[in-house]
Structures are given as C-alpha cells and as structure tokens.
C-alpha cells in the first residue's frame, strides 16, 4: 500500500461502499500473502490495520452505512481504526445500526467521542434546498436537524480532554 511520505496527515482508505454493485469488486475473494481466503474489502481492512500508520493514528477506512454486515466485519478486523461512514440520510443508512456495528473497540479511535466513527450526511442536507423558497434557511434547518441526530459531544459541548 502506498501512502504519503509525510509523517503527519491522515488517509482514509476505501474499504467497502454500500451501493449494491460494490460487491462485484469489493466482495471478490482473495487468497495468499499469508492471509485467509477472504473478500477484498476484508483484506483492505486487515492490511490497513497492520500498517505502522495505523498505530500512529493516521489511517482510517471508508465503510458505507447501508452495508451493515460489511461494517460489522470490517470493524472486527480493524478494531482500532477510525471509520468514515457515508450513506446515512438520502441513502437510507440507519444511525442506530451504524453505531451498533461500527464503533471502535480498541486503540485511539475507541477512546474518542463518536467511537471512532465519522458519519457523513451529504444529500440528506443538500436535498433540503432543492424546492425551498429560501434555500439557505432550508440548508441551515436540515444541517441543524442532522447535527442534533448525530451529536457526539457531551452536553457541555467539549470533550473531557478539552475541559482539563
């Protein structure tokens, strides 16, 4: 795997998208390299989790919200990596299911607010402006709604480390 040679920065690797066609490539079985026969997305998660950059907290995986079983499997293989999770909102990903299947169980990501998950909502916000007489107000309202549904900060607004 190639990564930037810089010692700082962060890279998200595409692991498993949730569109139905993704299984055609990301679900291909791969074998060899001292690893078990497994789907390609699992191999990506396994290789990413074993990288020195993972221990340094500089690698995460993109795993789609509507690919529930794949999210659970990727989390089992890459327990400590942060996940960027698109597909909540217009694509129909379920927040509760993502939280149940995707929270980090080890490493730096597990100790962060949000359980190592960064849930992305795009069209769920931007689609609100399509037919609105005041697109700005519609975007603001939709963003506010999603922010309240995805809130990860404690009521005082700051993670404990920031309060210390």
Task: Mark where each language-model region is.
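Short, glycine/charged-enriched secondary-structure capping and boundary segments
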Residues: 3, 26-28, 76-78, 98-100, ...
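Surface-exposed amphipathic alpha-helices with a cationic face
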Residues: 5, 48-53, 73-78, 147, ...
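Short, low-complexity, polar/charged sequence segments that are solvent-exposed and flexible
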Residues: 5-9, 30-35, 80-83, 102-105, ...
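Electropositive phosphate-/nucleotide-binding environments in soluble metabolic enzymes
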Residues: 35-42, 68, 92, 133-140, ...
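Non-catalytic alpha-helical scaffold/packing segments enriched in small hydrophobic residues
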Residues: 39-47, 57, 69-73, 97, ...
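A C-terminal functional module that forms or caps the active site or interfaces directly
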Residues: 61, 65-120, 124-128
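C-terminal helical cap(s) of enzyme catalytic domains, especially alpha/beta-barrels
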Residues: 95-107, 112, 116, 125-164
